Amino acid sequence: MDQAALRAGISPDAIVSPAAFVAPGASIAAGCRIGPGCVVGPDCVLEEGVELLAHVVLDGRVRLGAGVKVFPFATIGLPPQDLKYKGQPTGVAIGARTQVREHATIHRGSVGGDGWTRVGSDCLIMCVVHIGHDCRIGDGVILVNNIMLAGHVEIGDFAFIQGGAAVQQFVRIGRMALVAGMSGVERNVLPFGRVKGYRAKLHGLNTIAMRRRLGLSKEQVMTVARAVHDLYRGGRPEEHVAAVAAAHPGNPHVAEVLDFARDRGRHGLCPFGRLGEDDELDG
């Protein structure tokens, strides 16, 4: 194939290493840099300023937002690990300025979802993280090294998942939640919740994020903490939503927690763990 045809979808302002392979049909915007050993499939779209450092593989329908940076040996858009998948045209979409570090794997969606695995903007996906098919990752999420997300996991904005954690399929993790390292998450995690353990349990609130990112006072954090205490006061938390809502009218942060709790999904909420000296739920 002649060079003019090969570059038909490549901006003249993009820099592509002669040791990279960009398939005809790929769209490479201005300011992109594609390093040696990279492979970019024909259905990939790279917006302005995307950087693939070296030995990165993009396959299937991949959409990388402006300023995304992908480090060596990461793979994005390979087929899902789903025996029902038979080659349907599914994909991965990643928002602007997200970084994907070495050896991370992000699989394309499946026909069991809407066909897309989605990662938001301004995320940090550290080394050897696996994001399974049909996951939904919000903006500003940090996934530390060696995390495993099964298919259809949902993670809210600004959540922080520490290294080595494993999350079961269809689990939902709320906004600004914190999952401790090496935890096994089998049930949903409330917004602002802090969970840990081999079978993860709620051990407090992510009070640092609530204060720094939301600007909440200690008293405001304590109000949310009391609502969470009441939610877990015997029986299933979902059974207490109405009573807790009545006790905290007009509080948007309590309302966010309760809206999340109402949708039990497939797994329900993480159980409440016994608080220890390293835990806090009262801010």
Locate each region found by the language model.
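Terminal amphipathic alpha-helical/low-complexity segments used for targeting or macromolecular assembly
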Residues: M1-D13, P18-A19, G31, G67, ...
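Structural signal for interior beta-strand "rungs" in well-ordered beta-sheet cores
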Residues: A4, G9-K201
